[in-house]
């Protein structure tokens, strides 16, 4: 398992809570600094700390520091 950081808006967070998960593709940053940079540049203020499998593929580009999960990510509690 690895800890990653998913950046989203408040509106998206509400959808995640309503549906109980994040629909694929689920993109996340490997470190908080990149997530904060993304948050500031896009205006998305929410950063979620998620656990991805250790073998989650790297996302092309993105400074080689982003991962993607091509399955639904179920949220336990927020």
Question: Where are the model-predicted features located?
Answer:
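Conserved NAD+-utilizing ADP-ribose enzyme module
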Residues: 1-2, 10-13, 19-78
């Amino acid at each position: 398992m690895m800890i990653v950081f998913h950046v989203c808006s408040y509106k998206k967070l509400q959808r995640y809570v309503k549906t109980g998960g994040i629909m694929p593709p689920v993109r996340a940053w490997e470190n908080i600094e990149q997530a904060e940079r993304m948050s500031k540049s896009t205006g998305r203020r929410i950063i979620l700390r998620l656990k991805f499998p250790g073998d989650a593929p790297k996302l092309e580009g993105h400074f080689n520091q982003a991962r993607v999960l091509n399955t639904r990510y179920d949220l336990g509690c927020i």
